[in-house]
A protein has these predicted regions:
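SDR active-site strand-loop-helix element
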Residues: 7, 31, 69-75, 110-116, ...
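Conserved glycine-rich Rossmann-like NAD(P)H-binding loop of the short-chain dehydrogenase/reductase
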Residues: 26-35
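Flexible, glycine-rich beta-alpha linker
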Residues: 119-120, 134-135, 159-173
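N-terminal Rossmann NAD(P)H-binding glycine-rich loop of SDR-like oxidoreductase domains
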Residues: 4-24
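NAD(P)H-binding glycine-rich loop region in Rossmannoid oxidoreductase-like domains
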Residues: 52-90
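Conserved catalytic-core motifs of eukaryotic protein kinase domains, centered on the activation segment
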Residues: 40-41, 79-86, 121-125, 172
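Conserved Rossmann-fold NAD(P)-dependent oxidoreductase catalytic core, especially the SDR/UDP-sugar
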Residues: 69, 96-135
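Active-site Tyr-X1-5-Lys
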Residues: 133-159
């Protein structure tokens, strides 16, 4: 790979991936709402864009050929926002916006972060009451289904990466 985009680039998973990518000489455009408390090393292979993720992001990205777009940005992974359906729905829209950016820039592959928490969606019909945190898993599950369908319709190569519980230095979830 020569050029990639990583949303959530200053987050736990995004920054870890970026460090591995630059070790291999890959140029990375790291997108995050803030680089305060920067987790990324100084490298001429990294371009930082401090921005939210929506369709207007495409205007801020360098116009080059991209091999992959890794989407790790997701609001409300802990705290009260994890149970807020409005926040979780905005995350799904953000992921669809990323798919549209990929299509517009002819990015070869769109990779999106999922979670083992998606599996809660399969138990919902058997429960009388849920915990607020289940909304996060349900939203991730819905996001995957929407993206699988949408990316097929726009002919965008798509990979859903379902992670288990990930731990390490700097993880705040």
């Amino acid at each position: 790979m020569k050029n990639v985009i990583v949303t959530g680039g200053n987050g736990f998973i995004g920054s870890s991936l970026i460090k591995k990518l630059i070790e291999k000489g890959t140029r990375v455009v790291a997108v995050d709402i803030t680089f305060h408390g920067n987790r990324l090393p100084d490298s001429n292979l990294i371009t930082r864009i401090e921005s939210g993720v929506n369709t207007s992001l495409v205007e801020r990205l360098p116009v080059i050929e991209y091999d992959s777009f890794y989407h790790f940005a997701w609001k409300g992974v802990n705290g009260a926002d994890k149970a807020d359906p409005t926040v979780q729905l905005s995350n799904i829209q953000m992921a669809v916006d990323c798919a549209n950016i990929c299509k517009r820039l002819n990015v070869k592959k769109f990779l999106c972060a999922g979670t083992v928490a998606e599996n809660v969606a399969f138990s919902l019909s058997h429960l009388k009451k849920t915990t607020g945190g289940m909304m996060y898993g349900v939203a991730k599950h819905a996001c995957r289904i929407i993206l699988e369908d949408y990316c097929k319709n726009i002919a965008q190569q798509f990979v859903w990466m379902q992670f288990s519980n990930i731990y390490g230095v700097g993880n705040k979830t």
